[in-house]
């Protein structure tokens, strides 16, 4: 019987506990821990880069299975000691690469313990991928259903449309603002970033821009220079205000100097899907980033839904204030600004097709009872839902027009309003009455003026809903094809398809207020016959064709009344 050192004996199960084998195992574990520590250290320092992947693993059922399972499998195989594999080839990795014709050949050609571990890992990843797909499909449907039910439970129906703020009509479309504003400023090392909607210090709505570094060298070295806001409520004498102050972290700055990097570094478990809201307060520039979080629901199958997680207020000196919804609403710097995420509103209204259940909306077996969907916009609209408008009392609101389910439906079924400060939902249901949608309204605006060379010289653009005396109108702009001006505003009544053309900024305000002050209006046409006409009221039929064009001259005013109003009784001229 051979002598056996106690230090080299095996413990239960044949696992080495001492001697050289035990020391090898200890060295293996220490080495792997060191390698893992280096990986985690580098990952932590660069964590904003991996934010999307890590967040989805924590809050996406499919990615939790695939990404989380793959990470656990990798850790297990990483710490698993080398195991014996019968391999007669004993080829080096370099030789395997040279002789392989495809990645599969490399995978099958690797020998020894590394090759065995890699093949096992690939097998596990393949199984996890299939499982994640099988889980993601029902989890996605459950997410839509739960989100729709939450949205409906928190919403209240209104009997009439809330009144728009007549002092803040959206006169200047985004593309017109972008072109005219960029043509009015000159920066050699900077450019204007993407436009967004904010409130100016005087209460007007404005298109806002970050003044950010331009060019690769400047994005590495220079800082954001401040913010620029331009009034969207008037085309004449439009105000452009620049608030220049260097931002420590900002837009258009790369890596650790960027606002995005520092937002994710300071609050990792939140999504920053919305663009920054650039604005000023007491003459200083700021930027606000709405935040979206997610919450888990375990029944009937684990799934998540997005929620409002407050926002981040970025100061020029680099301070990042992470605010809860309540803190954001009470912050004096953010008074009057929009706080609720636009992207979350888009998700919530987009889920409403599931409000009557998953089966109801399925393409083959679904009854589609009460199913609605976000109204489509034509390609030339240069806008996207939800629309941002200002209501009375300087309350910004996100408006989404919903149409009945179906490819051929273009009329409106419901109109949803979201308070941009509180996230509260209200909606107006049309019941049996069908309102004109944005696509049809743009067609009516074009047909209302057959003398304009549409498409060649002028286009109708950016339909925005506006509520006037309880009625919904579509406020459409007519612009040259180069988007250098707004030649006139066209209002289309969503109920009657009645059309009003106005060229004057102050007249737009008067019309939205429910009255028209015609003294400041300009003639619609330059012809001698129309020199006293300040605007036209266009009456269209059900197809949108103009059947009557009523000129309103200087000294005249218009009032919209119900048919049973005594002022409308016996007016044969108007009726005939």
List PLM regions with ranges.
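Soluble extracytoplasmic regions of secretory-pathway and membrane proteins
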Residues: 3-4, 11-574
């Amino acid at each position: 019987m051979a002598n056996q050192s106690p230090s080299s004996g095996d413990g239960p199960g044949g696992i080495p506990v001492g001697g050289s084998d035990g020391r090898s195992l200890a060295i293996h574990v220490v080495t792997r821990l060191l390698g893992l520590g280096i990986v985690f250290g580098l990952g932590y320092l660069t964590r904003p880069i991996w934010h999307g992947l890590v967040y989805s693993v924590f809050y996406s059922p499919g990615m939790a299975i695939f990404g989380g399972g793959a990470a656990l499998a990798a850790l297990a195989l990483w710490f698993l000691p080398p195991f014996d594999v019968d391999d007669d080839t004993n080829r080096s990795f370099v030789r395997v690469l040279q002789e392989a014709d495809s990645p599969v050949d490399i995978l099958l050609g690797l020998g020894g313990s590394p090759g065995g571990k890699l093949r096992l890992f690939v097998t596990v990843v393949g199984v996890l991928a299939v499982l994640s797909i099988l889980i993601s499909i029902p989890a996605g449907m459950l997410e839509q259903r739960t989100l729709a039910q939450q949205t409906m439970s928190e919403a209240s129906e209104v009997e009439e449309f809330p009144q728009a703020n007549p002092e803040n009509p959206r006169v200047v479309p985004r593309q017109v603002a972008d072109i005219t504003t960029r043509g009015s400023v000159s920066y050699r090392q900077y450019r204007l970033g993407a436009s967004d909607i904010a409130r100016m210090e005087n209460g007007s709505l404005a298109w806002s821009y970050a003044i950010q570094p331009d060019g690769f060298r400047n994005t590495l070295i220079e800082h954001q220079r401040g913010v620029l806001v331009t009034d969207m409520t008037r085309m004449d004498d439009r105000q452009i205000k620049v608030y220049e102050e260097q931002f420590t972290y900002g837009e258009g700055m790369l890596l650790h100097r960027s606002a995005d990097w520092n937002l994710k570094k300071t609050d990792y478990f939140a999504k920053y899907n919305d663009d920054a809201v650039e604005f000023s307060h007491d003459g200083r520039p700021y930027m606000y980033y709405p935040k979206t979080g997610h919450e888990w629901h375990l029944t009937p199958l684990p799934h998540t839904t997005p929620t409002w997680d407050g926002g981040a207020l970025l100061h020029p000196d680099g301070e990042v204030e992470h605010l809860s919804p309540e803190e954001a609403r009470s912050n004096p710097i953010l008074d009057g600004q929009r706080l609720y995420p636009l992207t979350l509103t888009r998700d919530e209204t987009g889920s409403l097709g599931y409000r009557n259940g998953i089966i109801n909306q399925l393409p083959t077996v679904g009854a589609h009872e009460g199913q609605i969907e976000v109204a489509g916009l034509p390609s030339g609209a240069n806008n996207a839902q939800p629309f941002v408008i200002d209501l009375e009392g300087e309350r910004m609101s996100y408006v989404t027009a919903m149409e009945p389910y179906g490819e051929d439906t273009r009329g409106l079924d419901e109109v949803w309003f979201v308070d941009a400060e509180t996230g509260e939902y209200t909606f107006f249901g049309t019941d049996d009455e069908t309102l004109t949608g944005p696509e049809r309204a743009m067609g009516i605006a074009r047909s209302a003026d057959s003398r304009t060379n549409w498409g060649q010289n002028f286009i109708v653009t950016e339909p925005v809903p506006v509520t006037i005396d309880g009625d919904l109108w579509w406020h459409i702009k007519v612009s040259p094809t180069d988007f250098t001006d707004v030649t006139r505003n066209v209002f289309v009544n969503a109920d009657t398809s009645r059309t009003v053309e106005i060229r004057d900024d102050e007249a737009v305000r008067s019309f939205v207020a429910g009255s028209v002050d015609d003294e400041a209006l300009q003639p619609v046409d330059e012809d001698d016959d129309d020199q006293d006409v300040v605007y036209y009221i266009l009456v269209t039929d059900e197809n949108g064709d103009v059947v009557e064009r009523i000129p309103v001259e200087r000294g005249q005013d218009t009032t919209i009344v119900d048919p049973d109003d005594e002022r409308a009784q016996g007016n044969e001229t108007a009726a005939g």
